[in-house]
């Protein structure tokens, strides 16, 4: 079968590999669509992992939708022909962190994956992913392309659930890429009175306006002052950081007012520290929080929003490319110019 091998952001190759063989409690999925996530192009993170594992390349890809083509003899809940989304990470539900509601901090979740990765024609789904409810049979009303968004939208659902984004709030979203525009849509659904977004990219700014932001600001301006001018002299209730730029992290701190919640949905690279005016935050009861990944409850929410057609994900797809043009796709995502979501698919699908 064909797989996409990642050596670094500028060296992504289509190559041959063995088709995975499944065991009795596993399933084999033929990939139809696979999205490139922003985390796939976090080069420092990927190279560190490769060094730790002692391997020259990785087969990435975790936003997949496809069809079950083989089922192990002991699998009872799924059948050949099912159209599915598969979660690459699953929590155990039993550990201390899971019981406390921190499923994405679960050790099992951080160590589960499918084989080899979503940028392959076929992926083997291990028994644990099946047992822990990581396989979702998709309704006929959800396309493969929509299925690709269950995981990234699930991450967004988790962040806003933890921050309790709710009716009447002003929400500031720093970064108007794919995750920022998903946050924009969900915040409006959850009842936010005003959603303000920022970016430095003209295309992203245009898209944020198209998706209904009440205000779209250039990130290289004094956004805290502008927000006060358009928000009755108040700073945002919720601030969601959707870019790893250090400047955005600093802006998030600067834009926090009385009662604000600052959610780091994305963070700068390792070793970066941000100064916190802790005395001001103490007297104003500012909350700083992080959100990582998606738990099953969040994936369920994402699935239901997509099923109800409340979240527009199709218009976030700017490029549909065959596996053979994976390098072009990685360039588009890493450079983040006139693009949003890039979806890859096996060449035979493109040819048909």
Placement of each model-derived feature along the sequence:
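Mid-domain Rossmann-like dinucleotide-binding core that forms the NAD(H)/NADP(H) cofactor-binding site
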Residues: 140-221
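Short Gly/Pro-enriched turn/cap motifs at secondary-structure boundaries
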Residues: 7, 18-19, 55-61, 111-117, ...
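C-terminal hydrophobic helical "lid"/dimerization subdomain
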Residues: 250-254, 296-352
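NAD(P)H dinucleotide-binding glycine-rich loop of Rossmann-like/cofactor-binding domains
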Residues: 92-174
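Glycine-rich cofactor phosphate-binding loops and adjacent beta1-alpha1 units
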Residues: 163, 206, 211-285, 327, ...
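Glycine-rich beta-strand-centered segment in the early N-terminal region that forms part
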Residues: 20-34, 48-99, 136-139
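Short glycine-centered segments of the SAM/dcSAM-binding site in methyltransferase folds
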Residues: 83, 170, 260-261, 287
């Amino acid at each position: 079968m064909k797989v996409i091998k990642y050596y670094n952001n500028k060296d992504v190759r289509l190559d041959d590999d063995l088709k995975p063989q499944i065991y009795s409690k596993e399933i084999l999925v033929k990939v139809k669509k696979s999205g490139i996530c922003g985390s796939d192009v976090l080069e420092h993170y990927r190279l560190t992992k490769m060094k730790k594992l002692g391997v020259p390349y990785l087969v990435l890809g975790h936003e997949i939708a496809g069809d079950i083509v083989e089922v192990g003899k002991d699998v009872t809940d799924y059948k050949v022909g099912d159209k599915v989304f598969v979660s690459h990470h699953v929590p155990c539900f039993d550990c201390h962190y899971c019981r406390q509601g921190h499923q994405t901090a679960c050790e099992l979740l951080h160590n589960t994956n499918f084989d080899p990765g979503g940028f392959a024609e076929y992926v083997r789904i291990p028994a644990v992913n099946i047992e822990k409810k990581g396989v979702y049979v998709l309704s006929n009303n959800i396309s493969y392309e929509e299925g690709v968004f269950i995981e990234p939208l699930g991450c967004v659902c988790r962040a806003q659930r933890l921050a309790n984004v709710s009716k009447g709030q002003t929400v500031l979203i720093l970064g108007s890429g794919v995750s920022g525009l998903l946050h924009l849509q969900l915040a409006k659904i959850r009842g936010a009175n005003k959603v303000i977004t920022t970016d430095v990219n003209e295309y992203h700014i245009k898209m944020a306006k198209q998706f209904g932001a009440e205000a779209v600001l250039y990130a290289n301006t004094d956004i805290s002052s502008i927000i006060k001018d358009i928000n009755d002299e108040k700073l945002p209730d919720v601030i969601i950081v959707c870019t790893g730029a250090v400047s955005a992290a600093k802006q998030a701190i600067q834009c926090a007012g009385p009662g604000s919640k600052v959610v780091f949905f994305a963070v700068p690279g390792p070793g970066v520290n941000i100064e916190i005016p802790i005395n001001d935050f103490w007297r104003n009861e500012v909350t700083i929080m992080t959100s990582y990944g998606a738990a099953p409850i969040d994936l369920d929410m994402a699935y239901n929003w997509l099923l109800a057609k409340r979240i527009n994900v199709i218009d976030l797809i700017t490029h549909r490319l065959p596996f053979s043009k994976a390098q072009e796709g990685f360039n588009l995502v890493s450079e983040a110019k006139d693009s949003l979501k890039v979806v890859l698919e096996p060449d035979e699908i493109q040819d048909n």
